[in-house]
Amino acid sequence: MGLLQDYVIIVTGSASGIGYATSSTALREGAHVFGVDVSPLPADLCDHPNFQSFQGDLTEDSTAQAVVTACTQAFGNRIDGLLNVAGVLDNFASVDAVTDQIWNKCLAVNLTAPVKLMRAVIPIMRTQKRGSIVNVSSKAGISGGAAGVAYTASKHGLIGVTKNVAWRFKEENIRCNAVCPGGVLTNIGSDIDRESFDMEAFETMKPVQLAHMPDQSKGPRITPEEVAQVMIFLVSGLSSKVNGAVIPVDDAWSTI
């Protein structure tokens, strides 16, 4: 029997990267997974009998509630876990260079969308008197020197929300935790406008980046699967008293 046997969980960003790895791992652990992404979902997930999908833009006003409604229609009026994985990166712009477009997009995807999904699932979790929420923050959520101001603000904000939700609903057996991955090979940066990349700001952060990945030719140190394993632990009963935690998954990068 798997760690998540018969759990019903929602995973955002399921089409690739950490979201895909988390969805795949959860299915292997026996969960019913409702995957959400703005992009088409992979066939290997969609072909699994315990997987249902929703393709939509989480920044649109009605999408969060539509996701929760569709999940309950697919798997019944029960949601054991919400894993907010979907995110976007900025262009490393500092506060004197960030555009409204970059700022608004980072806040909408990385902070507002997870809040709306939490708002939509909490009533169900309160009724069933249990639930686990896991939010994907970042090294940039606990540091000022790992990304641009928009991404940094959005991920710091998500940690604040995580702690608030954990404290507010702890007496109702609803937990909320965050993970802070280090450098992971995903497509999160694929839509960055390279022409607006703030190289001057990035140069000031290079020592921080090199401390984590001294040999850039070897690529990121952390795999999506390694982050997924921590998220599965946090949504499972093994972590029943872990609540309001912010857990780095970065091979000690967070220590500096």
Swiss-Prot record:
Compounds in the chrodrimanin family such as chrodrimanin A or verruculide A exhibit strong inhibitory activities against protein tyrosine phosphatase 1B (PTP1B) and therefore, they could potentially be developed into drugs for the treatment of type 2 diabetes or obesity. Furthermore, chrodrimanin B, the end product of the pathway involving chrodrimanin A or verruculide A, does not exhibit the PTP1B inhibitory activity, while it functions as a potent blocker of insect GABA-gated chloride channels. NADP(+) binds at residues 11, 57, 119, 151, 155, 183, 187. GO terms for molecular function: oxidoreductase activity. SUPFAM superfamilies: NAD(P)-binding Rossmann-fold domains. Pathway: Secondary metabolite biosynthesis; terpenoid biosynthesis. InterPro entries: NAD(P)-bd_dom_sf (IPR036291), Sc_DH/Rdtase_CS (IPR020904), SDR_fam (IPR002347). Keywords: NADP, Oxidoreductase. It catalyses: 3-hydroxypentacecilide A + A = chrodrimanin C + AH2; chrodrimanin F + A = chrodrimanin H + AH2. It is an enzyme of class 1 (oxidoreductase). Pfam families: adh_short. Its EC number is 1.1.1.-. GO terms for biological process: secondary metabolite biosynthetic process; terpenoid biosynthetic process. The active site is at residues 137, 151, 155. Short-chain dehydrogenase/reductase; part of the gene cluster that mediates the biosynthesis of chrodrimanin B, a meroterpenoid that acts as a potent blocker of insect GABA-gated chloride channels. The first step of the pathway is the biosynthesis of 6-hydroxymellein by the polyketide synthase cdmE. The prenyltransferase cdmH acts as a 6-hydroxymellein 5-farnesyltransferase and produces the hydrophobic metabolite verruculide C. The FAD-dependent monooxygenase cdmI further converts verruculide C into verruculide B. PANTHER family: DEHYDROGENASES, SHORT CHAIN, ESTRADIOL 17-BETA-DEHYDROGENASE 8-RELATED. This is Short-chain dehydrogenase/reductase cdmF. The lineage of its organism: Eukaryota, Fungi, Dikarya, Ascomycota, Pezizomycotina.
